[in-house]
């Protein structure tokens, strides 16, 4: 069978067709200034001196954008490498052609591991948050807080091992030299918890968002067993004019710690013998119309970003990967807001 020769115009025509069909990655590329991340990424990732020769490293922006692709589509490292080779939209997003070298799974893993160990997740998030603030997209007129479970790979431990881990210790058997490989595969930071008769294992993504724009303005990562309200006050600052949250955040302790000019718009909770009055129910309904906007964020992550899960082990990687999820959500929301403003 005669080999098919692909010419320059064939490739251009295919890209043109992708644009006509509404390539979401092209839309994201059109509004993002990826160069704002270059200096920090280079500082953390530059390991070797190539001035004396040798193959130059893959550009840090290409590596970063490969991580963005991996998270948007919730792919494994191997699948990310495969899809970049297979899909023209991925190649165009990265700025590479059919004849260019494609980033491999090991390189993406090493890049993310380096960023995680350098605690770069929060740094990158804050850098983009500064862009959102400078463009006036975050109004601070209303702040919403909530948390969602982030499922992690389940561990098959004995009851005694789980008890030891829950006490903040590592089982002695795992610490033996011959079990070093086993310990590397054990997550001693994730926790089991139960909510509404559903069992969860992993971590929690505690999120603060701007009520007007639905942009995430802060976040924290904890194990799944920590109560939602434990990180609420850490999120608040003097710019916040009103705090919206569900009834899990209600209580005198949070109300007493609110900033002076921050209005308490947390939904009220009924108790045994003290049910909510009709007025309280009506007020809760009004508050919920604003508060529910944060659920749209988690819905986007579950749907458009193909799930809120992680495949890594340990709190360090969890902080990075969950932070990357929040950052990429902001990228996508930013693209939507920019496109909406030009309509």
Roles of regions detected by a PLM:
Residues 241-242, 247-316, 320:
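Helix-centered, glycine/charged polyanion-binding patches within enzymatic domains
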Residues 33, 54-62, 100-104, 286, ...:
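Secondary-structure capping and boundary motifs in well-ordered enzyme cores
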Residues 26-68, 72:
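Basic, short loop/linker segments at the boundary and entry of helix-turn-helix/winged-helix-like folds
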Residues 48-60, 74-113, 117:
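Trp/Phe/Arg-rich N-terminal binding region typifying the photolyase-homology
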Residues 1-43, 337-343:
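Charged, often Cys/His-bearing segments associated with DNA-binding zinc-finger transcription factors
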Residues 86, 90, 117, 241, ...:
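Short, well-ordered loop/turn and helix-capping segments at boundaries between secondary-structure elements
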Residues 316-343:
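Charge-patterned, long linear interaction tracts outside catalytic cores
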Residues 78, 82-85, 103-260:
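Polybasic low-complexity intrinsically disordered regions
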């Amino acid at each position: 069978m005669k080999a098919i020769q692909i010419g320059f115009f064939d490739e251009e025509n295919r890209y043109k067709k992708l644009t006509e069909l509404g390539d979401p990655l092209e839309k994201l590329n059109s509004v993002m200034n990826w160069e704002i991340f270059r200096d920090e990424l280079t500082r953390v990732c530059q390991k070797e001196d190539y001035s004396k020769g040798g193959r130059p490293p893959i550009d840090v922006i290409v590596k970063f954008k490969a991580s963005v692709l991996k998270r948007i589509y919730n792919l494994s490292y191997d699948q990310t490498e495969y899809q970049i080779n297979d899909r023209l939209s991925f190649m165009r997003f990265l700025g590479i052609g059919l004849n260019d070298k494609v980033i491999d799974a090991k390189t993406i893993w090493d890049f993310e591991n380096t960023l995680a160990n350098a605690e770069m997740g929060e740094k990158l998030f804050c850098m983009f948050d500064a862009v959102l603030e400078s463009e006036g997209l975050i109004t601070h007129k209303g702040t919403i807080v909530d948390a969602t479970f982030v499922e992690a790979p389940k561990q098959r431990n004995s009851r005694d091992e789980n008890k030891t881990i829950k006490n903040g210790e590592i089982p002695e058997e795992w610490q033996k030299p011959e079990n070093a490989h086993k310990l590397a595969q054990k997550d001693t930071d994730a926790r089991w918890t139960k909510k509404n008769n559903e069992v969860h294992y992993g971590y929690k993504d505690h999120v603060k968002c701007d009520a007007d724009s639905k942009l995430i303005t802060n976040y924290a990562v904890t194990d799944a067993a920590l109560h939602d309200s434990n990180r609420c006050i850490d999120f608040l600052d003097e710019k916040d004019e009103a705090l919206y949250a569900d009834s899990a955040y209600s209580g005198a302790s949070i109300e007493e710690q609110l900033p002076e000019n921050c209005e308490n718009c947390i939904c009220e909770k009924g108790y045994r013998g003290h049910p909510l009055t009709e007025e309280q129910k009506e007020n809760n309904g009004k508050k919920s119309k604003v508060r529910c906007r944060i659920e749209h964020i988690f819905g986007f992550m579950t749907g458009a970003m193909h799930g809120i899960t992680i495949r890594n082990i340990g709190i360090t990687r969890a902080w990075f990967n969950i932070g990357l999820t929040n950052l990429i959500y902001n990228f996508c929301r930013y693209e939507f807001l920019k496109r909406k403003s030009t309509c």
